[in-house]
Amino acid sequence: MIDLESRIEEMKSNLVSKNFRYIIKCKYKTIPAKEKDIYKEEKLKEYNYYVKLIKKLKKHIKNSSDIQFYTKYDKFNNLVCLVSKFDINEIDINLNIDIRIIIGDKYDTYMKTTYYQEKCGILYLEEFESGSRNNGYGSMLLDNLNFIIDNINNRLKNYNNYSETYNFKPIKILKGRAIPFKSVISQEDLNKLYTKYGFKIDNNNYLLKNRE
């Protein structure tokens, strides 16, 4: 019989400390429903949640050349991972940047963005999808977006410092278009959400936010 409590605390501790080595090597498996009578239901659910979260995070770490994540507690008191990742080797004119909240469930909250430069760095928000309705992850992502972008800017600055190939300008402007994921949020509610976090929205649902 597995000591679920100690394993849960072990996984949570290594997520909070951003222990990449642990996450890559972790091989815990979810416990199937047929064994649920052995364990308390809520503890089993929590254990399986963190096993799934680490598996998903591990996949992103393995598939990215530059990834950072931070943990937050959601409204269900579960740890979630706020992730930003990109592949510097795939840059052409623009750089694709993946920003998401990874949870120990099926669907992430996901923001597909593109970095490009004019007088300053600009981040264009192409897609913004939340995995399910009323879970608070869309608000969490937007609430932490400035922090995530500051981290991205620091990483881009490091590339400038270590290679003459790059001359990235810091991201100071956010642009994009508010396109709702119809099964989750309406256009009106999505616009209200963006407005709450400092975005200006025109009549065609185009977004603009200056970070200066």
Language model: regions and residue ranges:
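Glycine-rich acyl-CoA binding loop
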Residues: 134-145
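Non-catalytic substrate-recognition and accessory regions of acyl/acetyltransferase enzymes
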Residues: 1-133, 147-174, 179-180, 187-212
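Residues that cap or flank secondary-structure elements
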Residues: 137, 182-183
